[in-house]
Amino acid sequence: MAKTVLAVNAGSSSVKITFYTFENPPKAIADAQISGITAPPPALKFQRTGSTKHQEKLQEKLSTPQDAFKYLLKRCFDDPELSEVASESDLAYICHRVVHGGDYQDSVEINDDTMHHLEALEDLAPLHNFSALEIIRLCRKELPSVPSITFFDSAFHHTMPDYVRTYPIDQTIAKANGLRKYGFHGISYSFILRSVAEFLQKPQEKTNLIVMHIGSGASICVIKEGKSIDTSMGLTPLAGLPGATRSGDIDPSLVFHYTSDAGKLSPTATKEMHISTAEEILNKKSGWKALTGTTDFAEIAVESPPSEAHKLAFDILVDRILGYIGNYYVKLGGEVDALVFAGGIGEKSALLRRTLSEKCKSLGIAIDSEANDKGPEDDETVKDISKGAGKGPRVLICQTNEQFALTQARDNDEWLTCNLGLGPVKISLD
């Protein structure tokens, strides 16, 4: 029987793969990533478990996610010190992260029908599903004996009530076209819920959290009794908080004024305005890069910002996050077990955590400065940075792990059940 599970996380400019043992719990064997696909030369990071991380700039031309995935797979298969994954026959399953799953509430195994359904969603999320679907197509063609399982960032939020996910537009059109709030970062939120509930020694179904996944893409989720009841992202990941290149929430008509001569907005002036143009502007030409010229938040979140624009970008993000924290605190009736920071920025930026915590002191939020500045150790999944026990919600840092979440499993008689908290996919051990 095949011995490993391959987890794949594909973005527009990067592809990450991780091999895990096919056991309960799974153990990482090797991790490899190529970034900079859209800004050559591409960069490789590769590490076998227990060994030193290898990094290099590649001379190979890797211009698509498929190119990067094929390179990574060959690199791992050809590695003499990685005997566990020498060929396709060593793979039990391939687990793919797909951002937008539409109405799928659970993970699914890819077949002709499910693939057709996901391809139909490309019109709904052309900027977000493309890379993942390209790699799924490649796997079906070149690794046909290995089943592919898809896990959706949107599925975790299927528990949101109708009044949260419904947009006040013509419902005949909305339902025919799937126009509603979906929410994203669900794979991360599922991992965080499971990890934080265990840390707090509470059942997931009795856990109330406000969780911030703050990275180059940023969102917030409110979890009540172990279920998502609202989140900042919407029909697409563009809604909600600003990001490195995303605008976040704006007046919907702004984009038409943005692309027309000032003061000359008219039906004639906007007739050539296309959805693809608007998405390009708001997804890739906005956010803190538009304000500061950099996507690196570490250059923005500093005690003495290099410019007023950098300070403005930081203040905007803080302001927008505070709005959601207040909203979600009320939605939980003040019964909040923890305020959780996660994502690359949430985990690393002590200044952002301190600033937000100070501005939330009216909610009983307080942090230990030393613990906050130190941050979590590499092997510390959840770290408590609260100050003063029992005076308000705990303040935690959770180092989320979407790759591992794709392969978390539990034994179930003759089956192994992959489960992200999004619903199970039963996988035969035969």
Where are these regions (language model features)?
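N-terminal glycine/serine-rich phosphate-binding loop of ATP-dependent small-molecule kinases
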Residues: 1-104
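Glycine-rich beta-strand-to-loop/alpha-helix junction loops that act as flexible
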Residues: 10-11, 97-99, 214-216, 339-348
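Phosphate/pyrophosphate-binding loops at sites that engage ATP/ADP/AMP, CoA/4′-phosphopantetheine
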Residues: 75-92, 198-203, 325-337
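Short beta-strand-loop/turn "lid" adjacent to the catalytic site in phosphate-handling enzymes
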Residues: 76-128, 147-149, 155-166
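Glycine-rich phosphate-binding loop of actin/hexokinase-like ATP-binding domains
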Residues: 159-260
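Catalytic phosphate/nucleotide-handling subdomain of diverse soluble enzymes
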Residues: 223-265, 274, 280, 343-390
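Adenine-nucleotide phosphate-binding core of ATP-dependent small-molecule kinases
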Residues: 267-271, 280, 284-332
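Internal helix-turn-beta structural module
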Residues: 311, 315-337, 346-430
